[in-house]
């Protein structure tokens, strides 16, 4: 028997609360004065890198992202170095989909590639991101993947700070899928 929309919605709400509790318990939510990657100042910081080093929290993230991926037409899980790599790796293990790591720049040694893993033009990727603010950090990775001929229509972020990333990604025909929003996390 399939679940109704209200059952699915309740399930996502329970999952969100489970993730919020895990993020707080592992110390990933901090208060103080911080400068974000976007250059913005903030009174709070969400340290998903800390969360990704906690096996219980990482497992919750991977499981919840995998459930979202079941609804998507994708065949590869991608993550941008550094923060996206443990997330994408855990999700790849959970979904058994291939992993692609997107480097921030080309290395001047070895394969001299922006990618670790196989990327084919027919691939349909979902990108994992730790925290989204303006969406600028992930936009470069999306463009590099698309320049290689692959398709990328979804970015799953653990936490969306709700500061424009969804709108910016929509302009690039990418749907932002947050596991939790900052407003929910900071309640």
UniProtKB/Swiss-Prot annotation:
Keywords: Glycosyltransferase, Magnesium, Pyrimidine biosynthesis, Transferase
Cofactor: Mg(2+)
Positions bound to orotate: 133, 161
Binding site for 5-phospho-alpha-D-ribose 1-diphosphate: 103-104, 107, 129-137
Pfam entry (one): Pribosyltran
Pathway linked to the protein: Pyrimidine metabolism; UMP biosynthesis via de novo pathway; UMP from orotate: step 1/2
Enzyme Commission number: 2.4.2.10
GO molecular function terms noted in the UniProt entry: magnesium ion binding; orotate phosphoribosyltransferase activity
Example of a GO biological process term: pyrimidine nucleobase biosynthetic process
Catalytic activity: orotidine 5'-phosphate + diphosphate = orotate + 5-phospho-alpha-D-ribose 1-diphosphate
Subunit structure: Homodimer.
Similarity comment: family membership: Belongs to the purine/pyrimidine phosphoribosyltransferase family. PyrE subfamily.
Biological role stated in the UniProt entry: Catalyzes the transfer of a ribosyl phosphate group from 5-phosphoribose 1-diphosphate to orotate, leading to the formation of orotidine monophosphate (OMP).
Record HAMAP family: PyrE (MF_01208)
Protein name (record): Orotate phosphoribosyltransferase
Name of the gene: pyrE
């Amino acid at each position: 028997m399939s679940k109704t929309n209200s059952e699915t919605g309740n399930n996502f709400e329970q999952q969100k609360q489970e993730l919020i509790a895990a993020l707080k318990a592992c110390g990933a939510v901090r208060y103080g004065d911080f400068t974000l990657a976007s250059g913005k100042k903030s009174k709070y910081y969400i340290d998903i890198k800390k969360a990704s080093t906690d096996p219980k929290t990482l497992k919750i993230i991977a499981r919840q992202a995998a459930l979202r991926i079941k609804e998507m037409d994708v065949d590869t899980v991608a993550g941008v170095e550094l923060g996206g790599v443990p997330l994408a790796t855990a999700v790849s293990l959970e979904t058994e989909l291939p992993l692609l790591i997107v480097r921030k720049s080309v290395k001047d040694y070895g394969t001299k590639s922006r990618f670790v893993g196989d990327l084919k033009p027919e691939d349909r990727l979902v990108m994992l991101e730790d925290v989204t603010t303006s969406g600028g950090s992930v936009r470069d990775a999306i463009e590099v993947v698309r320049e290689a001929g692959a398709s990328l229509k979804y970015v799953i972020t653990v936490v969306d700070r709700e500061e424009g990333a969804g709108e910016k990604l929509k302009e690039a025909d990418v749907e932002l899928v947050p596991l939790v929003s900052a407003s929910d996390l900071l309640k």
